[in-house]
Every structure is written in C-alpha cells, then in structure tokens.
Amino acid sequence: MVQQGFSIDLILARNREEAPDGKDSVSSRPHIPCAPQPLAPTKYAKEIPRRKDGQEQGEITSFQCSSEEARNRQFSNPSLPALHRSSGSSDEFSPAGSEDDGTESSGRNSQENDTEHRSKSPKSDLQRRLRTAFTPQQITRLEQAFNKQRYLGASERKKLATSLQLSEIQVKTWFQNRRMKLKRQIQDQQHSMVPPPVCYPQTFSYYPGGFPVPLNSGSFYQPPAHPFQAPQHSFIPQPLHHHMRMSAHQEQFPPLFGAQYM
C-alpha cells in the first residue's frame, strides 16, 4: 500500500481538485461571518449625520466590494441565499423608510375618512334643516282643524294633506308641534295664576306671669271641615280677661286661711 501524507498542503490540494466538480464538502469551505441584523426603527433613524464626500464614496466602494464578494461566495455555497435575502431586504427597507411609509399611509387614511365624512355630512345637514314654509292660508286651515280636533286619524290627515297640497308627514309634524306649544302655554298660565306665598308677622299674647307665648297662625284661620268628617278641635288660647278674673278670685283668699283657726 502506498502511504499517503496528511500534510496541510495535500489536504488543500485535494480540496482544490474537488472544487470544480461541485462535490466539495461543507467542512472544506471557508467560514463566512453572519451579517448583522438591522436595528429597530427609532425616531433618530432619520437624523443620520452626513459625512464628507470622500468618506461617503469610500464607504460606497467598500460596500460594493463586500457585496461582490458575498455574491461570489453565494454561487460557491448554495446554503446562503436566505442570508443574502435577509441582508438585501434590510438594506432596501431601512427603519426611516418604514416610518415614512407608516406615516404616509396613516395620513392617507385620515384624509380619506375626512373626505367621506364631509361628503356625507352636507346631505344629513340638508335633510335636517329642511323645514316646510307654510302659507298663511295653510296655517289658518290647520288651526281650524286643530281647534276642532287635536288628534287626526289616518283618513282625516290624508284628506287635509290633499286639500292643502302637503304630505301626511308634514301635517303630522305640524300637529305634534302645535300640541307641544299648547301644553307650554297651559303650563305658563298655571304658573302665573298661583299667587305668591304671604308671610304674616308672628303675634304674642301676654299672660299674667309676664312671659310672652307665640300664637300660631292656625289659631286665626281654620279650614272648613269636611262634610263626612267630624271637625277637629284645635287648641285656641283663652282670652286675657278670663285669666285676670281667675287670678283676682284666687287672691281674695289669704294664703294661710286654714292656719288661723288651728
């Protein structure tokens, strides 16, 4: 048997011979570092400081060289298309570009919503603001019908609408508004007819002891009794002269009348 050497030169020579056939192993291929992942979008992505023209051109040329080397490696190694696709997509879609697209799409949506709202709002406003202008002849006829009957039936409403050249809905709304107006007028009249409350001064009656006792207003005025109910006797203070007679009669007897005959 022929002894084969295991030196590095022999191994590399074998790999070079096997490379054109396309049957080289993964272990013999050179190591390619992974591309860095793109940064998350931030508000400072748009504010990238500019450098001088010479530096920018140098960076562009170095980037082109690195991209060409990566393409050559891609053809030699078919297991790297996903890596290059991810790096290419990260180069094409920058964070600043994604933010710009998001703001533009949101602005377009808001503008479309505003235009739709404006296109719909004038129609609704016109429908709400449309009010029928009744002629004096129509108003007099409607007032006469309202004085006769405040609630119209379907047949009567139809006849009145055809005679006045109006729709049934217009006649119905007019009668509703007229009933509300009459209700407000009645409420105003009731408030005006109620007299304001009168506050009477508080009176006092002086008894022999010299202490004033207030008299309630109920002692001067009593409501009439119900015919089917017995009148309730309210407390009425006795007149002053009655108390004076009682006090004079009591003073005729001495305080120690029984003690003299003991």
Curated annotation (Swiss-Prot):
Q: Name one GO biological process term.
A: negative regulation of DNA-templated transcription
| SUPFAM superfamilies documented for this protein | Homeodomain-like (SSF46689)
Output the InterPro entries linked to this UniProt entry.
HD (IPR001356), HD_metazoa (IPR020479), Homeobox_CS (IPR017970), Homeobox_NK-like (IPR050394), Homeodomain-like_sf (IPR009057)
Where is this protein primarily located? nucleus
The GO terms this record gives for MF are: DNA-binding transcription factor activity, RNA polymerase II-specific; sequence-specific DNA binding
Q: Which UniProt keywords apply?
A: Developmental protein, DNA-binding, Homeobox, Nucleus
Q: Does the keyword DNA-binding apply?
A: yes
Basic and acidic residues: bias regions: 16-26, 44-55, 114-128
| Composition-biased stretches (Polar residues) | 58-79
- The entry's DNA-binding region feature spans 127-186
Positions of the UniProt region annotated as Disordered: 16-129
Q: Where in the cell is it found?
A: Nucleus
Of the GO CC terms on this record, one is: nucleus
What's the record's remark on domains? The N-terminal region is required for repressor function.
In UniProt terms, what function does this protein have? Transcriptional repressor. Cooperates with vent2 in a ventral signaling pathway downstream of bmp4, which antagonizes the Spemann organizer and dorsal mesoderm formation, and leads to ventral mesoderm formation. Acts downstream of bmp4 to repress transcription of foxa4-B/XFD-1'. Binds to DNA with preference for the target sequence 5'-CTATT[T/C]G-3'. Also binds 5'-TGCATTTTG-3' at a lower frequency, and occasionally 5'-TTGATC-3'. Binds to the homeobox 2 (HBX2) repressor element in the promoter of the myf5 gene. Cooperates with vent2 to repress myf5 expression in the ventral domain.
List the PANTHER family: HOMEOBOX PROTEIN NKX, VENT HOMEOBOX
Full protein name? Homeobox protein vent1
- Source species, please? Xenopus tropicalis (Western clawed frog)
